[in-house]
Design a protein with these regions (language model features):
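Non-ligating segments of multi-cofactor redox enzymes
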Residues: 1-191
Length: 191
């Protein structure tokens, strides 16, 4: 699959995340998601030993990958890569709930909706992007730990304006190898 010219991506600044889970709540509220279905998750990792322990936070969702493993694994073609923003979407009308996409995704993005017996995942709030608005998770993050934009703009630090000026990385501890699927996310690591 060729690189999408306007690929929308995530930016996550580990230094600004306080693990308040406002991003999770904003997403759940935007989509009225049932208990057990979380399109965005804050992962808390403890590292090190006394006297130098460290706690790290990672807010993660679907990374709308360049080479989506979920799409390749789906036996009924329920996944597509949308043309305007490069967002990976699932057609729940086609989904048979086999969970192969969840098994294939190294980032744990697709989740099973027990009520619908279908898979669910982050849509990057494409309905909001289409109106020029930020995704719900970005809108609700009080610490500006989460941002979105065109991936080239994020990589060249043109967006978000004034929020960061640190070296970017394609991975953090606890995040799967980006060489697997080409995730559309960049990080500023906690220093």
């Amino acid at each position: 699959m060729a690189k999408h010219p306007n690929q929308t991506g995530w930016y996550y600044n580990e230094n600004n995340c306080i693990a308040c889970r406002a991003c999770e709540a904003g997403c759940k509220q935007e989509f009225d998601l049932p208990v057990g279905v979380r399109r965005r998750r804050v992962i808390i990792r403890e590292e090190g030993k006394y006297p130098n322990p460290k706690v790290r936070y990672l807010s993660t969702a679907c990374n709308h990958c360049e080479e989506p493993s979920c799409m390749k694994a789906c036996p009924v073609g329920a996944y597509t890569k949308e043309k305007i923003f490069g967002v990976v979407l699932i057609d729940q009308g086609k989904c048979i709930g086999c969970k192969r996409c969840a098994a294939a995704c190294p980032y744990g993005a697709p989740v099973f909706d027990e009520k619908k017996s279908k898979m669910d995942k982050c849509t990057f709030c494409i309905h909001r992007l289409s109106e020029g608005l930020p995704p719900a998770c970005v809108r609700t993050c009080p610490g500006y730990a989460l941002w979105h934009g065109k991936l080239p703009d994020i990589e060249e630090q043109r967006t978000p304006p004034g929020i960061y000026r640190r070296p970017l990385t394609k991975t953090l501890p606890g995040f799967a190898d980006p060489k697997l699927t080409g995730p559309s996310v960049r990080f500023s690591e906690n220093k």
